[in-house]
Each structure stands twice: as C-alpha cells, then as structure tokens.
Amino acid sequence: QGYQAGTDSFSDNESAKYAVNLLSDLGTKGYFEPGFASVDFTSACNLFFGGSGAIFYTGSGQISLAEEMYDNGELGFFPVPDTEGMDNMSTNVPVHAGFAEGFNKATYDDTMQEFFDYMCENFTDACYNQAQVFSPFNEELPEGLPQLYYDTQPMFEDAETAWTSWDDKLDSDVMTKIVDEQQKLAQGITTPDEFIKTCDSFVEK
C-alpha cells in the first residue's frame, strides 16, 4: 500500500532490496529450471511431483499429488524462512483465503438466506471431499484425509498476522509491469539496481 501510494519504494525498503537480490541470484545461478519464464503451472507441477524439482511453492490443492511421496518420505514442507538481520514475524506461512462473496442488501430475501446458510453449513465438507483443499472455516479436520493435512494444519492455527498480497494491493497496470521486470531480473537481462530504479518509476510520488 505504501508503494502504491508513493510513500515507500524498493530503494528505501531493505526487505524489498534483499528480495530483489535474492531473485536475481536464484535466477542467474541455476536454481530455476531452464526456460522457467515460459513454464505454466501444470508443467511446474509435473516437474516437481515427477521428482525433477527440488522446491515448489503451492497450496493444498496439490496435496493429492503429494500424498504418496509424502507418506514415503520422499518430500516434505517448510514455512517461509526467517531472514538473518531482518525484522521477521512469527506468522511464517501464507494463508490464501479464496474468493469473497458479496450480497445486495435490497434483494437479500429468505431464499438467499437459506442458500447462504446451506453454503456455510456444507462448505467445509465440499472442500475436503470434493475440491480436496483446506477449508477456510476454522473447523476440525475430518477423519480419513491424507496425513499432510494434519501435519500442516498447526501452522495455520498458530498464524497471528495477516497481510495482503501484491496482487490485491497494486493496480493491474503496475502489477503487470513489475512481473515483466521480475522475469527480466531472474533471467539476468537486468541487474538488481536497474530493477529497483525501473519499478520505483512505476508509481508517482
């Protein structure tokens, strides 16, 4: 929000500069797969769960793919690591809450209330038994799920701090430009200093 408002910048934010340099190192020192800039999510899943990738950022929607490998001790999970010398927070796992629902007060009638009640009462069951993802509701996990659900849930229960992703803070034009610059940074086309200068120019102070 500070960046979008022009009150903060990459050049003035130590955490942002650290992240820029980290992305540059990961991209230019061989940590990403060849041709990573053109890889879609399905291809990335196949690479990781096929045993060729080492680290993959994903959500509970892929637990069904990870279940057998996790049970066999072939993969594990870890939260966002702390950074030495930085102001770290105790909440170290991103929790994505899905989509918001909006209702029109003028047309909200008994039928809509019945639907809303039904949705809330059955949403958790649909998450685990149909969509196979974590439910956003703070309810007990049902029995019979893959072990990975039970082992990762404590990280969410202990989360104390919430934050908003860049996708929601920035307008679409600025977000698109930053993503384009990230691609160039990770491929070594631009330097960290060039990235910082360019991205700071996207927002008027």
Q: How should these model regions be labeled?
A:
Residues N129-P136, E140, Y150-E204:
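C-terminal capping/gating helix-and-loop segments adjacent to ligand/active sites or protein-protein/ligand interfaces
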Residues A44-F48, L65, M112:
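Short, hydrophobic alpha-helical packing/hinge segments within bilobed ligand-binding/sensory domains
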Residues G35-F49:
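Short helix-initiation/N-cap motifs at beta->coil->alpha
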Residues G50-G59, G73:
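Alpha-to-beta junction loops
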Residues K29, E68-V133:
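Extracytoplasmic/periplasmic substrate-recognition and gating elements
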Residues Q1-A5, V20, N88-N104, Q153, ...:
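Periplasmic solute-binding protein
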Residues G6-A37:
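Glycine-centered hinge/linker elements that transmit conformational signals in sensory
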Residues F41, T58-I63:
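Beta->alpha turn/N-cap motifs
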